[in-house]
């Protein structure tokens, strides 16, 4: 277990790791809102370091180029985890909270979500796919503001910025792009996607945390 290397000014003072989530890669099996299954076509990857996390969701309306991602830090206060969205591709840097029940295979998260100005109960089932002996969280700044978060865990590297997100998988020592989306309007040449990937490749990443 490593110590925090860098407490940035935009960090969450109350951030607190949840031991059962530290160093985990989780994939969502399903989501229910008001007991109805939703977002069946959406693939979700959640990588957790200690307090830093990334959550990348792609495939809305069965379009792999449509996504939502957020990243930040968690605060664990049994049985609840509060997720602080320090970066959110939808622009909403608030927080959300869920109560967790842990199982041998993963965890069940329940809470409330607002849809069309109505507060509704939700349930998400998460499958734990990996326990990593070493997970590293990095941050990139721009004008003393948090600009991007990257988490490296086993074969996976996931990056989130305000304008999009990317997931890379190590294939025999080569990082290959697995999924990417950008919030910028689609352009014929894919310039916004290329610009996003260039940014992730060239950003000045600083180690924020290891697990």
Where are the model-predicted features located?
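Lipid interaction determinants
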Residues: 2-69, 82-211
């Amino acid at each position: 277990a490593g110590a925090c290397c860098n407490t940035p000014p935009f960090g969450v003072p109350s951030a607190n790791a949840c031991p059962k989530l530290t160093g985990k890669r989780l994939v969502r099996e399903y989501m229910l809102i008001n007991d109805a299954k939703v977002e069946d076509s959406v693939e979700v990857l959640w990588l957790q370091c200690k307090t830093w996390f990334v959550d990348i969701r792609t495939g809305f309306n069965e379009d792999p180029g449509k996504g939502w991602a957020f990243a930040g830090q968690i605060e664990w206060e049994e049985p609840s985890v509060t997720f602080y969205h320090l970066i959110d591709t939808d622009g909403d840097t608030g927080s959300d909270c869920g109560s967790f029940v842990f199982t041998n295979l993963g965890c069940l998260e329940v809470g409330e979500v607002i849809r069309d100005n109505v507060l509704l109960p939700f349930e998400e089932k998460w499958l734990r796919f990996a326990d990593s002996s070493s997970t590293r969280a990095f941050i990139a700044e721009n004008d003393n503001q948090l600009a991007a978060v990257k988490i490296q865990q086993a074969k996976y590297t996931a990056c989130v910025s305000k304008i999009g997100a990317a997931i890379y998988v190590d294939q025999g020592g080569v990082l290959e792009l697995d999924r990417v989306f950008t919030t910028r309007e689609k352009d014929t040449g894919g310039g916004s996607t290329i610009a996003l990937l260039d940014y992730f490749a060239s950003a000045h990443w600083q180690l924020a945390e290891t697990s």
